[in-house]
Amino acid sequence: MKTAIFTVVLALAVFAVLSFGWEANEKALSEEFTELIHEKEAASEAEARECRYFWGECHDHMPCCDWLVCRYKWPITYNICVWNRTFPEK
């Protein structure tokens, strides 16, 4: 009887250790995935700030892309980037 109880307790201890290991691994993967997503967001934000695209709001600190020009268009109450009738060179 003592051997059976000892075996059950030992099995529960092994399962607890394995469960803790899987949980730690899952948490590490989750943190790594979250970090990767934040890196991708930061890269896309930096890319988006280089210039404003067609119909994007523009100011002195937010310039339009090379083939666009910043203009005031009524009834919109702010400046937008519109096409300057040129084509970007590739």
UniProtKB/Swiss-Prot annotation:
It is found in: Secreted. Expressed by the venom gland. Keywords: Disulfide bond, Ion channel impairing toxin, Knottin, Secreted, Signal, Toxin. One of its GO terms (cellular component) is extracellular region. Residues 20-50 form a propeptide. GO terms for molecular function: ion channel inhibitor activity; toxin activity. Belongs to the neurotoxin 10 (Hwtx-1) family. 13 (Hntx-13) subfamily. Residues 1-19 form the signal peptide. This is U7-theraphotoxin-Hhn1a 6. It comes from the Eukaryota. It comes from Cyriopagopus hainanus. The presence of a 'disulfide through disulfide knot' structurally defines this protein as a knottin. Disulfide bonds join C51-C65, C58-C70, C64-C81. Ion channel inhibitor. Pfam families: Toxin_12 (PF07740). The keyword Calcium does not apply. The keyword Secreted applies. Its main location: secreted.
